[in-house]
Amino acid sequence: MIHRIKYQRLRIELASPEQIRNWAERKLPDGEIVGRVTKPYTLHYKTHKPEKDGLFRERIFGPVRSGVCICGRYKGIASGKETTKFCEHCGVDLTRSRIRRYRMGYIELACPVTHVWYLKRLPSCIANLLDKPLKELESLVHCDLFTARPINEKPTLLKLHGLFKYEDQSWRDVFPRFFSCGGFEIFRDREIATGGDAIKKQLIDLDLQSVMSHAHSEWEELTKQESTGTDWGDRKIQRNKDLLVRRMKLSKYFVQTNIEPEWMVLSLLPVLPPELRPMIELGEGELITSDLNELYRRVIYRNNTLLDFLARSDSTPRGLIICQKRLVQEAVDALIDNGIRGQPMRDNHNRPYKSFSDLLGGKEGRFRENLLGKRVDYSGRSVIVVGPSLPLHRCGLPREMAIELFQAFVIRGLIGRNLAPNLRAAKTMIRGNKPMIWKILQEVIEEHPILLNRAPTLHRLGIQAFQPVLVHGRAIHLHPLVCSGFNADFDGDQMAVHVPLSLEAQVEARLLMLSRRNVLSPATGEPLCIPSQDMLLGLYALTMENRRGIYGNKYSLDSNKETYLKNFSFPKIPYFHGYEDVYKAHQQREIHSHSVLWLRWQTNFRMITSTPREEPIEIQYETSGISYRIYNHYQLEINAQREIISIYICTTVGRVLFNQRIDEAIQGTCQASSRQTMLYIGNKEDRFLSSEKLNRRYK
């Protein structure tokens, strides 16, 4: 077991065979060393007690019942002050049964077996270090290929190099006759190797420092190489450079952590504690078991068969031994990661066995389910719904959830204000939903941020801080613009609520994790708070033109303009002096969101038009020298000195409302920045015309 105060971090790395043996082996008071599992048995079919030397043996893993040995001679737990009691008859430690949760065993394999994670997981660590194709190594591991001279520094008698297939007729005629003679086992193992033994010998022969230096020199040569002029050639060079970089990094990690590469080939296989792979007895003597037990049994069966073949190697055909080595490799692969890049092993009901990797990975794996997915105090969970009326940094917290999360703070407020004499009275008042409870709760949440988290938390924006607002119902109200960081939508997604308790956590939530401080992507720098889906539809409906078109209801610039002007009766378009007049008329229902109007605009403006040098549709003159130039989207009032007195733009009520909201948002965000008012009318090909240019045009 790991002491959580003494050890503050956990590192997962390769274990050496000696370390695996130290995990499992222990010396009993009678001098016997136990820990090795040699039999594929689990429980006796009648008594349901662990079998001897099996996967549940009490002598190896500890007693099933606390303080009770197999023979029943002792039935008491040893005291902590005394030496651990030990049954001399059956050899079981008289300790608590919880020890079966972390006491391990091991299986001594008859042949080296490669670890499937480091061979078949992409990118393959073994293939990267040995600088060989992965398919070639897989064929070698499964005994489809043989390698000659696996250890380079030793002398050889055969002039063999590289790989060859045992299935070739020439090799099948020569090698059985040559290697079947007695006394040639050492010579045979030195000259020719296959399976995990061949991989292990090549890894032992590696010099990591020379591998790093050689890879670095090759990388420098590739960096000096000029472009080939073709995409395929450039991609090939880049792939080779990436491969060399991975090889250098991998070699560096092995050197820094003092891990030997040959540890990626297993000679001892750890056996998990029985409580992590249980067998449970149901009614009427029926047993259900973990899939790991069946996979362990298959490994032991095949390993024991290989041991028998090797013990009778003089009379056992060489091909049968090689085939059995392949079966042992496949059994260990299925135990560690069943079905990786191949067909998985299945039970009698055609269901794939759950391997060690399946128990660790995934949403229901050991890490996410038991270590990362623990229940946390001061947390809750509910469905999210849209809250468009909320500010960006606020969220709607259901009253029922808020009173549970902040109950301790409310109780402290009640007792501190002498509204409740003790804890029990305060809880009674909370259950009674007294009006003062909600007032105190409102005061508490105004000064206390909360954290919202949506699983899976793939980046730091998966957890953001918000200022809560009490809402009715049972759903969390969330502003739609913050959904991009959470990758959330409102089709039934759930989010977790956490209350930061310490002062440091609250300061971090306010200064770093508040949603309005995380509007840009930390990876790309692009904005995250972008309107989408229903927001775009709403903006489109708000700013859309009327059925006749905002640009065509008064004037038309088509080729048949004169005929159009004669036959068309101009509607009366209202004039407004400012935003306030538009708001009042809209509230009094004199105009609607799509009504066209003339709005007085500032003269120090910047405007976008669709025509580079647009000519006025109509010019009106007064006796005082004032003229009115009417364009497609705006009209100008110009005095006798050719100066612009006033400007009216043709727009809609919806666009006025939208522009005002954008203007208020910009002023609230950038109060100190000076800006020029901008009105967006026209299409994408519009250009900017400033008031200075217009004044110069009319002078």
Swiss-Prot record:
GO terms for cellular component: DNA-directed RNA polymerase complex; mitochondrion; plastid. Belongs to the RNA polymerase beta' chain family. RpoC1 subfamily. Its cofactor is Mg(2+); Zn(2+). Mg(2+) binds at residues 489, 491, 493. This is DNA-directed RNA polymerase subunit beta'. InterPro entries: DNA-dir_RpoC_beta_prime, RNA_pol_asu, RNA_pol_N, RNA_pol_Rpb1_1, RNA_pol_Rpb1_3, RNA_pol_Rpb1_3_sf, RNA_pol_Rpb1_clamp_domain, RNApol_RpoC1. It is found in: Plastid. Zn(2+) binds at residues 69, 71, 87, 90. One of its GO terms (molecular function) is DNA-directed RNA polymerase activity. Gene3D superfamilies: 1.10.40.90, 2.40.40.20, RNA polymerase II, clamp domain, RNA polymerase Rpb1, domain 3.
